[in-house]
Amino acid sequence: RRSFFQYIYISSFMDIFEVPMPVTIYHNPACGTSRNVLAMIRQSGEEPEIIEYLKTPPTREKLQELIAAMAIPVRDLLRRKGTPYDELGLDDPALSDAELLDAMMAHPILINRPIVVTEKGVKLCRPSETVLEILPNPAIGAFTKEDGEVVSPQAKK
């Protein structure tokens, strides 16, 4: 049996050498914003876990967890353009969060993207430079988006 102090020592040792949480991106390769965010993550020195959410949608529980971590209303995660949003009548303010989640589970294209998860937080990264707020190393230098816009972020502490 280990003593209390041995547990404290082991716990402290593990904290010192803790492996950082990997960066995860819920990605749609057909989306320019999502491609820009992925490129910014890589330029920061991270190789993220890439979840192509249209091929591998999050579970309902995971989606609820992401929404809670972003501290946004469910409705704010809905994508309108290029989706069945209008046909499904999702602009109806009477629809509950559960009904909106049902729609996103049935039609993952309704989930706005990209969502990025890091040890510093979870964000819907629109515009793409929003990702810099949660990257472990946001000092990526000058970055040129696909549309030619140059982003010159400063390191944030």
Residue ranges and their predicted role:
Residues 1-20:
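N-terminal amphipathic/basic-hydrophobic helices that include classical n-h-c signal peptides
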Residues 6-8, 25, 84:
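Intrinsically disordered, low-complexity N-terminal regions enriched in serine/proline/glycine
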Residues 9-11, 33, 127:
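Residue-level detector of bioactive/disordered segments in secreted/extracellular proteins
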Residues 15-19, 42-44, 60-62, 79-80:
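A short alpha-helix capping/helix-coil boundary motif
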Residues 18, 22, 149-150:
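Detector for intrinsically disordered, low-structure N-terminal pre-sequences
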Residues 53-157:
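Thiol/selenol-based redox catalytic cores and closely related redox-interacting motifs
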